[in-house]
């Protein structure tokens, strides 16, 4: 059963439809990149998957026992979030809030936070203040926090915005490793078409007048890709 099955979905807000007739499936272990024009509804789709907004029409179904609160979400960072005055460990542990019972975090949750930091190679930063870290280090911390929330699905919204090219390339490799080694399904919104076709298994290309969904190979052969990329093959 697919983790997410989207059939004939239209999305919008304040009476404005921004995406029409979306059709795609996300299976366990997939790495789906969502690309496309500005204003085509990519972030709106993310909000719908998270249950923050309703679909205007169609069906967006979650399978394999996946619950919205079990999605590990890494949003776009703003200035206030970058200046958050907490330790790295506290930020990572906050990823367990959705499963927290009672006043205190459990021993198992604390162990999960430690394991997530180890996966992202940030254990030595655990006592550092989050706002003192570099942009790349902060994104690793936030990804570790997202891992605390899920064993099934990571949802990443433009996770490399503002990072330099070297750090960006490293972050993409980390995400791919998490997908391959730990079997965690990844959905990522990205404007980086080159990295999308080189790391993902599937592409959802959103346009104002429709969408394309398929494997990376199918996408590279499509007219949608050729028109959007200017006819250049990036992979």
Regions found by a protein language model. Give the residues of each.
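Conserved ABC ATPase signature
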Residues: 129-133, 137
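Helix N-cap at the start of a conserved alpha-helix in ABC-type nucleotide-binding domains
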Residues: 165-167
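H-loop (His-switch) and adjacent beta-strand-loop-beta switch element
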Residues: 202-216
């Amino acid at each position: 059963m697919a983790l997410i099955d989207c059939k004939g979905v239209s999305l919008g807000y304040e009476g404005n439809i921004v995406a029409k007739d979306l059709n795609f499936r996300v299976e366990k272990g997939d790495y789906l990149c969502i690309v496309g024009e500005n204003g085509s509804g990519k972030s709106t789709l993310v909000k719908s998957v998270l249950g923050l907004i309703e679909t205007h029409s169609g069906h967006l179904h979650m399978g394999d026992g996946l619950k919205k609160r079990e999605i590990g979400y890494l949003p776009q960072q703003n200035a206030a979030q970058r200046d958050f005055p907490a330790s790295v460990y506290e930020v990572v542990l906050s990823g367990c809030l959705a499963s927290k019972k009672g006043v205190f975090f459990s021993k198992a949750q604390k162990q999960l936070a430690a394991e997530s930091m180890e996966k992202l190679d940030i254990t030595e930063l655990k006592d550092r203040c989050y706002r003192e870290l570099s942009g790349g280090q902060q994104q690793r911390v936030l990804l570790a926090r997202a891992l605390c929330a899920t064993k099934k699905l990571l949802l990443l919204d433009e996770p490399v915005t503002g990072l330099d090219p070297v750090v960006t390339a490293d972050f993409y490799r980390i995400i791919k490793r998490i997908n391959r080694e730990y079997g965690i399904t990844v959905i990522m919104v990205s404007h980086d078409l080159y990295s999308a076709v080189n790391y993902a298994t599937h592409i959802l290309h959103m346009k104002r007048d429709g969408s394309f969904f398929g494997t990376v190979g199918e996408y590279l052969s499509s007219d949608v890709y050729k028109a959007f990329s200017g006819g250049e093959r990036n992979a």
